[in-house]
Swiss-Prot record:
InterPro entries: Band_41_domain (IPR019749), CUPID (IPR021774), FERM/acyl-CoA-bd_prot_sf (IPR014352), FERM_2 (IPR035963), FERM_central (IPR019748), FERM_CS (IPR019747), FERM_domain (IPR000299), FERM_N (IPR018979). This is FERM domain-containing protein 4A. PANTHER family: FERM DOMAIN-CONTAINING PROTEIN 4 (PTHR46079), FERM DOMAIN-CONTAINING PROTEIN 4A (PTHR46079:SF3). Scaffolding protein that regulates epithelial cell polarity by connecting ARF6 activation with the PAR3 complex. Plays a redundant role with FRMD4B in epithelial polarization. May regulate MAPT secretion by activating ARF6-signaling. Residues 5-307 form the FERM domain. One of its GO terms (cellular component) is cytoplasm. Disulfide bonds: none annotated. One of its GO terms (molecular function) is protein-macromolecule adaptor activity. Residues 351-371, 538-665, 698-741, 757-810, 862-949, 961-1020 are annotated as: Disordered. SMART domains: B41, FERM_C.
């Protein structure tokens, strides 16, 4: 079956569509393809059927694949029929004329195939309307008799009831003569009016038997289910309207319906089941029973949809309007796709999986086409009006020119056959221009070309001059560059000489721009040699000094690397080149001595700005006394201390980077390294290098971003030292169980480089004592992660409900389908599910919530949440027998109240999120205070302590954010700002303990404090 199967679809206009159906093609897609051949919009009334082995029509289920249906086991292509599946009261409710035409063709086909029982006299009258629609008015008896043999007008049963064919033809001719003057549309409308009045119209008949084996006809329509005598399809014996039915189900050879009968009284109190419910059962082969069940469900859904949409249905059109429209449109229009592929009565379709060409055309409505045509017509009129105005303006301009010159221009617009107007020249318009004052066009273009060449050559000369003045090159290369510079000057002088010649010819003064460039080049070469000597002296003084973040008013403004976004644009003129040359002295050399490489003078504009004052050295040394560590940091090269240089060391031969351990028995101070201004892309790559694992609470490395006074970036990294197992910080290693740590960089913060110092031993011991006092609140596995939502046993239970999905899955042979059920007084439909397999199935007609063990409304009954009290039994959803669904089961918790399971989980999540948000707000306030109070040594140590504690805990924040966003409800997640989700954890040790355990602390001033209005609104 992988190569597909050939199918032949019989259309209502006697055409046949042949196509190769692919295995994955759905029945809905096949219906779209067939409908596209009629440009059909209202496809909901139609379906595709096939004749099964019992001789009954079996309809394709639109949500299943075509080849999954049980087709007859015959050779050759599968025969399918496109016809009407759902009927309505009148064609006046149909919107499109094509739909009315197809209903007419379907009615003719059903009567001719004897699917509808019709009296013989009615058949003769209907045949006359068919002749009037196809052939027009009556002409002669012979023509009518020949037409009746060609048209499908007289069914076989009507011919059998009468002695001869001539009698039947005479009766048709009598009716046909009375229809003279009727249009085609009127004939169709009158035909459908008669057919719609028939009691058997719109009913699908199925042959069944009852328990005694008596044969019956079971009729299904949009009105309900009817039971007919086997020899009489007109008058039903039993009528079951859809509003009376409760449930529909089948099992193998049995089809049953539960009918609500209010007149039926209960016999005794011991009666099982409902007293007002009567069950009716019919029997047939399993394939036919399943087909009846599927048709009953589809008819009930169509009944509900029409009942729900009656208020939205537009006013029905009158039959006279429909007749006029049908007459004007003519015969049924087929699509271009059908005409292209048709050969006589057979349409050769392509692969059934290619549906886009037809479905797009069928989806466009007639009203949309009319609107498009109206818009195009209005656009055409606007363009024609604009063209007329432009032509009038052109005529006026041409006439004015003709009055001045005495000759009508050739651009004057003339209509076909129109003679050009005669225009007289005005008096006094003749004059003569001075030819000497007009510059020839060739000389003007030559001067412009020379000016462009001079601008380009001046930039080339300036670049050659800068290369020639570079002192860090060899003598040979310097000589070559000097020669190139002299040649560029010579060419520049030649271009200027040519420009001056042209300027003298045009009466302008000559220029001397090339000589100025030569003089500037000589002065610049002398200045560059002097500035290089000054830079070398300045390098010696800078390398031996220890630099702090407060030395420069720029607070460590880094030398900008020659990147694309920091490089200044090239000068566009000679003045820009001269200004750039004069500004070169504002930059200073890098403090690094060139060792393996040397900087050229071309890099000078990208180096850091000269220091404006040197008094920052003494102030910084007073504020931070020099120690051994300071001296070591100052003497070593700043580039080697930079985190960029040390990255390969961190990622050396191991997937787990080294853990920075912090000593607490030596004084610690802040040392600055050489800052590097990096782009956001480079910052993200650095963040990947800084990811590492840690087993100690205090040694969690984190890149903290903070804003300093001038807005310059500072990047904080912990200094790595040898670890000591006896450090007090290591005692908290049992409180954490992180396998990895993520780093978060807020978008509004600038990440900066600087070395983060450790705390003093007294501060560490103080924090250790605080942790020991709050050790009872610490859990072995909580440590800042999501709160545990599992139910707690014993006295520690908080009453939070637990949603545990059971692992029971519906069997693979069952198919669960959902249908919308509209309940009286409800605006939104209730989802009703039907359970279907090859052997049995169930469908609820009314979605009533019951608690009985019988077949209920699609399994949609429920029991309320019950509290187990002291026994510890929790409420449980009782599954229905009618369906197999995954239902939530509750944990065994005795502290529940009724209906408190979902509320407890939501309340616990809400409290945890509010605690973390409040802690973040207090931490932001403390961080801001500590960052602004850095003028004294004591204040700076306080800031370092708070920042360090926050630094050791902040690595867990991204995991908290991910868990929070996953656990919160969708409405609360959508209304939570991203800045609050990605917040930094609290900075004080007390808040860290609260953060780790996820429990509220009674004496915390923040837990009693502000609760964000946004979160309050979302919680409610």
């Amino acid at each position: 079956m992988t190569e597909g199967r050939r199918c032949q679809v019989h259309l209502l206009d006697d055409r046949k569509l042949e196509l190769l159906v692919q295995p994955k093609l759905l029945a809905k897609e096949l219906l779209d393809l067939v409908a596209s051949h009629f440009n059909l919009k209202e496809k909901e009334y139609f379906g595709i059927a096939f004749t099964d082995e019992t001789g009954h029509l079996n309809w394709l289920q639109l949500d299943r694949r075509v080849l999954e249906h049980d087709f007859p086991k015959k050779s050759g292509p599968v025969v399918l029929y496109f016809c009407v599946r759902f009927y309505i009261e009148s064609i006046s409710y149909l919107k499109d004329n094509a739909t009315i035409e197809l209903f007419f063709l379907n009615a003719k086909s059903c009567i001719y195939k004897e699917l509808i029982d019709v009296d013989s006299e009615v058949v003769f009258e209907l045949a006359s309307y068919i002749l009037q629609e196809a052939k027009g008015d009556f002409s002669s008896n012979e023509v009518v008799r020949s037409d009746l043999k060609k048209l499908p007008a007289l069914p076989t049963q009507a011919l059998k009831e009468h002695p001869s064919l001539a009698y039947c033809e005479d009766r048709v001719i009598e009716y046909y003569k009375k229809l003279n003057g009727q249009t085609r549309g009127q004939a169709i409308v009158n035909y459908m009016s008669i057919v719609e009045s028939l009691p058997t119209y719109g009913v699908h008949y199925y042959a069944v038997k009852d328990k005694q084996g008596i044969p019956w006809w079971l009729g299904l329509s949009y009105k309900g289910i009817f039971q007919y005598d086997y020899h009489d399809k007109v008058k039903p014996r039993k009528i079951f309207q859809w509003r009376q039915l409760e449930n529909l189900y089948f099992r193998e050879k049995k089809f049953s319906v539960e009918v609500h009968d209010p007149r039926r009284a209960s016999v005794t109190r011991r009666t099982f089941g409902h007293s007002g419910i009567a069950v009716h059962t019919w029997y047939a082969c399993p394939a036919l029973i399943k087909s009846i069940w599927a048709m009953a469900i589809s008819q009930h859904q169509f009944y509900l949809d029409r009942k729900q949409s009656k208020s939205k249905i537009h006013a029905a059109r009158s039959l006279s309007e429909i007749a006029i429209d049908l007459t004007e449109t003519g015969t049924l229009k087929t699509s271009k796709l059908a005409n292209m592929g048709s050969k006589g009565k057979i349409i050769s379709g392509s692969s059934g999986s290619l549906l886009s060409s037809g479905s797009q055309e069928s989806d466009s409505s007639q009203s949309a086409k009319k609107d498009m045509l109206a818009a195009l017509k209005s656009r055409q009129e606007a363009l024609e009006e604009t063209l007329r105005q432009r032509l009038e303006e052109l005529k006026r301009l041409c006439l004015r020119e003709a009055e001045l010159t005495g000759k009508l221009p050739v651009e004057y617009p003339l209509d076909p056959g129109e003679e050009p107007p005669i225009v007289r020249r005005r008096i006094g318009t003749a004059f003569k221009l001075d030819e000497q004052k007009i510059l020839p066009k060739g000389e003007e273009a030559e001067l412009e070309r020379l000016e462009r060449e001079f601008a380009i050559q001046s930039q080339i000369t300036e670049a050659a001059r800068r290369l020639a003045s570079d002192p860090n090159v060899s003598k040979k290369l310097k000589k070559q560059r000097k020669t190139s510079y002299l040649n560029a000057l010579k060419k520049l002088q030649e271009i200027e000489n040519a420009i001056n010649e042209n300027r003298i010819k045009s009466g302008k003064k000559p220029t001397q721009r090339a000589s100025l460039v030569i003089d500037d080049g000589n002065i610049a070469s002398e200045d560059s040699s002097l500035s290089d000597a000054l830079v070398l002296e300045d390098e010696d003084s800078q390398v031996t000094s220890t630099i702090s973040p407060l030395q420069s008013p720029h607070k460590g403004l880094p030398p900008r690397p020659p990147s694309s976004h920091n490089r200044p644009p090239p000068p566009q003129s000679l003045e820009g080149l001269r200004q750039l040359h004069y500004h070169r002295t504002d930059y200073d050399k890098s403090p690094l001595k060139p060792k393996m490489w040397s900087e050229s003078s071309l890099d000078e504009p990208y180096e850091k700005v000269k220091k404006r004052s040197s008094h920052g050295h003494s102030s910084s040394h007073k504020r931070f006394p020099s120690t051994g560590s300071c001296t070591e940091a100052g003497v070593s090269s700043s580039l080697q201390n930079s985190p960029i240089r040390s990255l390969p060391h961190w990622n050396s031969q191991s997937s787990m980077p080294s853990t920075p351990d912090l000593r607490v028995r030596s004084p610690h101070y802040v040392h600055s390294t050489r800052s590097v201004d990096i782009s956001p892309t480079r910052l993200h790559s650095l963040a990947l290098h800084f990811r590492h694992r840690s087993s100690s609470l205090e040694s969690q490395g984190k890149l903290l971003g903070s804003e300093n006074d001038t807005g310059s970036p500072d990047f904080y990294t912990p200094r790595t030292r040898s670890s000591n197992g006896s450090d007090p910080m290591d005692d908290c290693s049992s409180c954490t169980s992180h396998s990895s740590s993520e780093h978060y960089y807020p978008a509004q913060m600038n990440a900066n480089y600087s070395t983060l110092a450790e705390d003093s031993p007294s501060k560490a011991r103080q924090r250790q004592r605080q942790r020991q006092r709050a050790a009872g609140a610490l859990g072995s596995a909580s440590s800042g992660s999501m709160p545990n939502l599992a139910a707690r046993s014993g006295a520690a239970s908080t009453g939070g409900g637990v949603y545990l999905h059971s692992q029971s899955q519906p069997s693979s042979q069952y198919r669960i389908k959902e249908y919308p059920l509209y309940i009286e007084g409800s605006a939104t439909p209730v989802v009703v599910r039907s359970l279907e397999s090859d052997q049995e199935g169930h469908y609820s007609v009314k979605a009533q919530f019951k608690t009985s063990n019988s077949y209920t409304a699609g399994g949609l009954f429920k029991e309320s949440w019950r509290g187990g009290g002291d026994e510890g039994d929790a409420g449980r959803l009782t599954p229905s027998r009618s369906q197999i669904l995954r239902t939530p089961s509750l944990g065994r918790d005795g502290a529940h109240d009724k209906g408190s399971g979902r509320a407890a989980v939501s309340d616990e999540l809400r409290q945890w999120y509010q605690r973390s948000t409040a802690s973040h707000k207090e931490h932001s306030r403390l961080s801001h205070t500590s960052s602004t109070s850095s003028d004294s040594g004591s204040q700076y140590s306080t800031s370092s302590q708070s920042t360090f504690v926050a630094h050791s805990r902040v690595t867990r924040m991204p995991q908290m954010c991910k868990a929070t966003s996953a656990a919160l409800p969708q409405s609360q997640r959508s209304s939570t700002p991203s800045s609050e989700i990605g917040a930094t954890p609290p900075s004080s040790p007390h808040h860290i303990l609260t953060w780790q355990t996820g429990e509220a602390t009674e004496n915390s001033p923040i837990m009693d404090g502000s609760e964000s209005p946004t979160h309050q609104s979302t919680d409610e």
